[in-house]
Amino acid sequence: MGELIAILSGKGGTGKTSVCAGIATALAQAGSSVLCIDCDVGLRNLDISLGLADTASMSFLEVCRGEYNCDQIPRHPRFPMLAFLTAPVNCLADDIDLSAFSAMLRQAREQFQYVLLDAPAGLDAGFRLCAAFADRCVLVTGCEPAAVRDAARTGQQLEAMGKLDVRLVVNRVNKKLFSTMDITVDDVMDRAGLPLLGVVPEDANVVLAAAFEEPLLDYTKKGAAAACRRIAKRLLGLPEPIKVR
């Protein structure tokens, strides 16, 4: 059975979706079969970070309804080990049938080694939907005080839900800004109260790749792309140092 990983954030604007896309493509490049699901109902944008823009047409709701099976999910044209389901645009997270969603995920676990759920920011129904079924949770935060405080609150909520494997990714790390603020990644980790999975540097290539409709890991090999590869290796259980660049 495959492993289900929820990619979460307490605060919007942390770059969670770009991190999710980077991890998914890195896992696929490493040879793992991956299904990436955009769970931000009504506000989907994971397709952009994957370099698919609006070409991704199959939503997870169609699989939940039985219109398609998991073996019919389209593969990424550049990453044959990566499949993608977009979010439906004309419903609310509260409208998702939990039993149908659970059945879809069970089927997905049988087809893929990793299932990544890109959850909406915050602690509402979409967050609970993704976290409830996750084997592991990856919490993405920035370094600004509001983001770190929200990450700590989100971690507490996950603990209350019985989620014990929760790890932190600090995104958009700028060493000059850290120096000016007189903080370190260790400070962010301590304030969030979570173990560290990885650090992703501030990188203009993330925005440029999306603008040119390119997957980040195809657009560049450095910066944020390299950081996502290191995170993927750690998720695979491989020894990989955490670097701050």
Regions found by a protein language model. Give the residues of each.
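Residue-level signature of catalytic and energy-coupling elements of molecular machines
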Residues: 12, 46, 63, 118, ...
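P-loop/Walker-type NTP enzyme "switch/lid" segment
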Residues: 36-110, 210-217
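Conserved beta-strand scaffold positions in the cores of enzyme catalytic domains, especially
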Residues: 4, 84, 196-199
